[in-house]
Amino acid sequence: MDQQRKNKEFIINYLTDISGIVKTRALAEKYMTDEVLIGQIEYFDAAFPRYEVYINELIAEGNLVVVRARFKGTHKGDLGGIPPTHKTVEYNFVIRYEIENGKIINHWLIADQMSLMEQLGVVPAAAASH
C-alpha cells in the first residue's frame, strides 16, 4: 500500500475514533504530537462534549491529508465566554494534516465560524447572510 493511502486510512481511523466520545489527551496523543491541535480538541470537547465529525472528502499528497468535513455537537460548555446554549450545531470545516512517522505533527484549519455563531444565536441570522 502506498504512503498516501496509508495516510488517508490513518486520518479516517483517527476521525472515526474521536467522533462521538470524550476526547482525552491520551486518545489525542495516540494520533498526534501537534500540541496546538490537542489543545483545540480539548477546548471544543469541553464546549461541545462528545462532538461528532463526518468526513465529506479526503485528498492526500505526500505526507499531507486534506479533509473536508462537518462538525456536529451540542453546546454544553463555555465557548470563549459564550455560556452554554444547549443548542445543537453543525458547521463545515477543512483541515490539512501533516503526518510524520505515523503521527499528526502539524495542521491548518479553516471553519465556518460565522455559521457556528449564527446557530448559537451570537450573530443574528440576517447579519450572517451579508
Language model features by range: what are they?
Residues 1-130:
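C-terminal and inter-domain tail/linker signature
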